Swiss-Prot record:
This is Cytochrome c oxidase subunit 2. The chain crosses the membrane at residues 15-45, 60-87. It catalyses: 4 Fe(II)-[cytochrome c] + O2 + 8 H(+)(in) = 4 Fe(III)-[cytochrome c] + 2 H2O + 4 H(+)(out). One of its GO terms (molecular function) is cytochrome-c oxidase activity. Cu cation A1 binds at residues 161, 196, 200, 207. It is found in: Mitochondrion inner membrane. The keyword Magnesium applies. Mg(2+) binds at residue 198. GO terms for cellular component: mitochondrial inner membrane; respiratory chain complex IV. Component of the cytochrome c oxidase (complex IV, CIV), a multisubunit enzyme composed of 14 subunits. The complex is composed of a catalytic core of 3 subunits MT-CO1, MT-CO2 and MT-CO3, encoded in the mitochondrial DNA, and 11 supernumerary subunits COX4I, COX5A, COX5B, COX6A, COX6B, COX6C, COX7A, COX7B, COX7C, COX8 and NDUFA4, which are encoded in the nuclear genome. It comes from Danio rerio. It is a multi-pass membrane protein. Residues 1-14, 88-230 are mitochondrial intermembrane. The lineage of its organism: Eukaryota, Metazoa, Chordata, Craniata, Vertebrata. Its cofactor is Cu cation. The gene is mt-co2.
Amino acid sequence: MAHPAQLGFQDAASPVMEELLCFHDHALMIVFLISTLVLYIIIAMVSTKLTNKFILDSQEIEIVWTVLPAIILILIALPSLRILYLMDEINDPHVTIKAVGHQWYWSYEYTDYENLEFDSYMVPTQDLTPGGFRLLETDHRMVVPKESPIRILVSAEDVLHSWAVPSLGIKMDAVPGRLNQTAFIVSRPGVFYGQCSEICGANHSFMPIVVEAVPLEFFENWSSAMLEDA
């Protein structure tokens, strides 16, 4: 969960998000080293009065500033490609959920069950219970079992939306007429908040996402209760 004056990412709640945090630190260190080197060169050039008017070209320097950036790009690309493959890998999901974006709410359908589907609207500020988060709470949460592979299919009914939960490292575009998919594993129980991350109209800021991860037996009890109420 984000908090005021937060400078870093939210706490990771999935293996993919943990990998993304490590990759961020890896890339940030490379950027820091490059920035330090460039700053040192600029200061050295400005602070000295010595100049060399006779070096018009240097084969060695040209080799260095061609090979070195290539090596740096490879060091960034390899871990990035690894994470991309991890995000695309879907092996035997325990639960498949279809999320459809509407103006301006989300609807969820648990495709492994015959009639388990519901709409999820933002709770208005005046209806919040003590401890609720303004503009983030919903009347129905997307409940998933923890430590289980979850496949989510994302689409939209009207305009472009985007289903995003930062703690899980997920951001998937919801496109009308197109079905995108991704997978995730929630590594610990908890409630994780997200929002539509694609400007989709006047009430774009008022279609939050709430994912609640619970133990498997709690999920089975919840799904049974939802089916009885359907």
